């Protein structure tokens, strides 16, 4: 009977949340996808242009780069939007390709940035002075008439400029290298590495811009793409998560058996759920700590509701009015990445 009650509660919760989401606060995955694609493309292009033109501090470049690490979430949203929106379904292949190309471009740019950091740390100023003029030529390619790239037309224009610039790059690099070979003790290996990374990055960026521009049309040749993004789980991380969960369950199970606590079954079940949720977080320990503190806050809130508010209300409407503010706080916290653990526990 208890199991049937829980199933009924879950079903009612899903139906209620679905009705409210569809009728009261309609937010469609397809629209969110389009907004995310536009925002991410514009932000990344501006970031690259500012970084390569020297407008960003090197430490600030590293901080901004971490904001673009939402590849898995984007792929999950694309998979859901395919069933909801016919326009997204027609562009599904290009969206998957866009995600993969963005991952390649951002990774390549990060590698180039790390190489330049190493050259700065090693004091290889000659190699830096030789390659940086090429960097400063890229920012104008990512604008149209001096304005930032935003629309598909702007992206197509930038893709054409990047392609032409990339095709001319090997010849120019060879000419520069021929001049540098005459200089004794010049770090040619560092220059060659930077030039190769730059060429590969421009190739990835041009592909990314071309795919973004192709989204303006319902059908496009770039839709026919065989590769797919396949997330892979780190075996070491999975093993550690399994050991951590087993240790917690065994410890709490021993405590339950030794104390004969009537609520021990709920303790073990909640611990297993907490370990499962925490294992998917980048920092499982911090997430578990947040969920623990959120649970403590929820207990205090529960005492307040049970003994302070419930005796003074009568009827379903007043019950909703009493619960809504506290539930809203938990939902708000769960939407903030830094507070998600607290909100999820509440």
Swiss-Prot record:
Coiled-coil segments: none
Intrachain S-S bonds: none
Bilayer topology: Multi-pass membrane protein
Principal cellular location given in the protein's record: membrane
Ranges that cross the membrane: 10-30, 248-268, 291-311, 315-335
GO molecular function annotation: transmembrane transporter activity
Family membership: Belongs to the aromatic acid exporter ArAE (TC 2.A.85) family.
Functional description taken from the UniProt entry: Involved in the resistance (detoxification) of the fungal toxin fusaric acid.
Listed name of the protein: Fusaric acid resistance protein FusC
Organism of origin: Burkholderia cepacia (Pseudomonas cepacia)
